[in-house]
Amino acid sequence: MNSSFYKRQITSFFNERTKYDNDFTYNRAIKLIDCVDLAQGETILDVATGTAIVAIAAAQIIGETGKVIGVDISPVMLSQATEKITEANINNIKLIESDIDQLDFDNNSFDTIFCSSSVPWFTNIPHTFSNWYCWLKPGGKIAFSCYSEESFLTPLIVELCQEICNIDLPDWNSITGTPEKCQHLLEQAGFNNVVVKQEQLGHYLTIEEAKNTWKGDRLWINPRGNPLIDLSEEQLTKLKSAYDAKIEDLATAKGIWEDITIFYVSAFKTSFKQK
């Protein structure tokens, strides 16, 4: 997939989320703070900071002697973040509008790096983790969240694409979709003491809500490609009909269960400087 086109898709997707904050998004993100110990005076990087949920909480813990840098690709999300930071009268957060892949911080710059629910969006996750390792000070830590490969109704769409159209639709969560995959990626980058905590955020959907999770269109924002764009209208219609029928088959008295298994992952850089 063309990288610049993909990044424009991501930016547009998040620019449309003008009311991002709610109980779900807040509670999901804020739990990252509990994954690592923060101290007064730390320098923190919050990757894909969004509306600064994590950045604000971290800034309040590290105090005025500390600093948080929040990076996000979406100007609309950063506008919401700026309003919240101003309202909270916080002065130790700097926001940067940028693709994190285009930034290059000095080695040993940060005590902690956070990233809430955004790692799967990155085009080269091993490279991203290697960068984070370099940017961290010796003894520094990272904390990020991601979802299991069984989360949401995505596996159903992927299965039907293979079964009906013989195409391999990439699952957004597949690269980091198990605790073992997360641990392997981090250890490859040099991290140690990897901890993966698992939590279930799933809920029941109505049949109509479940059907609307995929509208039968060609939209599929994924760094590993989008084979839906090559399908004919006839194929898309057939695929959508099969998806809706499968949803109806899965219905129970409570509705359609949408699994949302989230991993809260933390790890450390070795406490001595690498040569």
Which residue ranges define each predicted feature?
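Class I SAM-dependent methyltransferase SAM/SAH-binding core
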Residues: T43-L103
